[in-house]
């Protein structure tokens, strides 16, 4: 609908894509793009893999959680659009926490993560290609299942040397839309 409004109503916007896939989609739809180098966002909208009753999120199945977190942190207002199936009683119920790591830190990070007593840690592997998924930042992704995610988990993960970012979004100021059918 945004692309249609740009064409029909001469709506003037610039999108700041968080991935090459979104950048390509914007190009196909005729939505002009920019970057955080050039513009500060007025607002952000995105989706989520899971959302709890406190509007904490798990994001990152697409592997762009570093750029997503950077954009959300840079925005005065963030809207998260989800359908009711994304609502969970506790984060981690349906999806693991994705963690973007520097490749050479893999063994070290896995060792440090084991101290958090996760249910499972898996290196995200490519489908239709050999080897692990490599993010646009040149890093790998560990998917970490946890039965319980304490409030300090995001900062604990971020404090591990070799972790660039996680897909855990705790206590961000977001407005979640679409939870009711």
Regions found by a protein language model. Give the residues of each.
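Glycine-rich N-terminal segment of FAD-binding domains in flavoprotein oxidoreductases
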Residues: 1-6
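Short active-site oxyanion
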Residues: 9-15, 56
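Catalytic nucleophile loop
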Residues: 15-21
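Conserved phosphate- and dinucleotide-binding cores of soluble alpha/beta proteins
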Residues: 21-181
């Amino acid at each position: 609908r945004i692309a249609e409004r740009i064409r029909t109503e001469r709506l003037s916007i610039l999108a700041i894509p968080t991935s090459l896939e979104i950048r390509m989609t914007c190009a196909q739809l005729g939505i002009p793009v920019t970057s955080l180098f050039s513009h500060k966002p007025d607002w952000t909208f995105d989706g989520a893999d899971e959302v709890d009753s406190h509007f904490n999120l798990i994001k990152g199945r697409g592997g762009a959680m570093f750029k997503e977190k950077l954009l959300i942190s840079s925005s005065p207002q963030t809207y998260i659009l989800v359908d009711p199936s994304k609502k969970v009683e506790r984060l981690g119920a349906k999806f693991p926490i994705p963690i973007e790591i520097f490749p050479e830190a893999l063994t070290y990070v896995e060792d440090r993560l084991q101290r958090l007593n996760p249910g499972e840690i898996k290196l995200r592997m490519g489908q239709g290609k050999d080897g692990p998924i490599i993010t646009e930042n040149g890093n790998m992704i560990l998917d970490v299942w946890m039965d319980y995610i304490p409030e300090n988990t995001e900062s604990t993960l971020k404090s591990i040397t070799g972790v660039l970012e996680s897909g855990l979004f705790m206590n961000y100021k977001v407005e979640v839309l679409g939870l009711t059918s």
